[in-house]
Amino acid sequence: MENALKRLNALPATEAEAELLACCGASRWVQGLVARRPFGSVAELFAAADEIWRSLGREDWLEAFARHPQIGETAVEKQIKSETGQHISSRWSAEEQSGAQRNSADIVARLAEGNRAYRQRFGYIFIVCATGKTAEEMLAILERRLQNDASAELTIAAEEQRRITRLRLEKLLGAETR
């Protein structure tokens, strides 16, 4: 991980931005993290990533959410609309959502309907850190979160995005465990 951190620190800004965009689609988060380089340790990188994320607001969070495929949607059904980091982000999304890819037609239909209801209610896609969750678990979470008020749900979705971003930073650095 330390060698990967050294490489990230040494990359030209545009290349570092492209790699970090695969971790989080909020451009101000990416720019803020690139501006803070070099990082002395992985822990320092993670702390900066969290600090920057928590300093952002609604529009930044929505920008990050918009770069995700919906839960249950395959990479073929949606190519992430990013000019950089697309192939890495698409692959990571597919891996993270693997629990939603192998399920019954009923679960797929219920996830699709839940996604539509969620987008209609909140104005953005359902964001959940899907790693390690089954489709049934994600559906239950989606159904529970549909009951939230808009403010509470945005806060929850932003925290889920932060968790996704942390996992993707770990992948970027070559870590296999949290």
Residue map of PLM features:
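Aromatic-anchored, charged helix-turn/loop surface patch used as a conserved interaction hotspot
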Residues: 1-24, 28-114, 163-178
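C-terminal non-catalytic interaction appendages of large macromolecular assemblies
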Residues: 97-178
